[in-house]
């Protein structure tokens, strides 16, 4: 079972938030909290609050054991950005984009659930690649059969 918490329009760049997200994926929640409390980044405090919210959601709403939870996924996607101008020389101006993030933390009580999902995705990709290879071979076969078709003319002279 997966429990999650979301937070939108967080005033931090998604590139900076992803660095912190990568630290906690696959860890136990207690370990993740320790990592986040010792990480000297602004994103660490924001993700720590979101992690605590996800833990509360898992225990209160889904009846999961808080000690047996793992961080299944931590995602920092791009949110809307605020555009500001800064004056430059000769009456011109440049744009400043103040980026925001949409954060999602997902928790699971099964530590092998992530590996199972990865195996399923790899199987789907393999199946898709095999289908593409079959289609490519069929196209090549069709092209070669058109090329090998006997012609009615030989050297410009009809028979």
From Swiss-Prot:
Annotated segments matching region Disordered: 129-159
Q: Which GO terms describe its cellular component?
A: cytosolic large ribosomal subunit
Q: What keywords sit in the KW lines? A: Antibiotic resistance, Ribonucleoprotein, Ribosomal protein, RNA-binding, rRNA-binding
List each coiled-coil range.
Answer: none
The record's listing under NCBIfam families reads: rplV_bact (TIGR01044)
Oligomeric and partner information: Part of the 50S ribosomal subunit.
- Specify the protein name: Large ribosomal subunit protein uL22
Gene transcribed to yield this protein: rplV
């Amino acid at each position: 079972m997966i429990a999650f918490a979301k937070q939108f329009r967080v005033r931090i760049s998604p590139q900076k938030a992803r660095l912190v997200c990568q630290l906690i994926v696959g860890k136990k929640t207690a370990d993740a909290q320790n990592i986040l409390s010792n990480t000297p980044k602004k994103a660490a405090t924001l993700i720590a609050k979101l992690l605590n919210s996800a833990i509360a959601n898992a225990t209160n709403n889904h009846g999961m054991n808080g000690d047996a939870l793992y961080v299944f996924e931590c995602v920092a996607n791009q949110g809307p950005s605020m555009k500001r101008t800064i004056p430059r020389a000769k009456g011109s101006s440049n744009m400043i984009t103040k980026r925001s993030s949409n954060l999602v933390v997902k928790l699971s009580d099964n530590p092998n659930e992530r590996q199972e999902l990865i195996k399923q995705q790899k199987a789907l990709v393999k199946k898709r690649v095999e289908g593409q290879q079959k289609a490519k071979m069929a196209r090549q076969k069709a092209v070669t059969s058109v090329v090998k078709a006997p012609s009615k003319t030989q050297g410009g002279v009809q028979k």
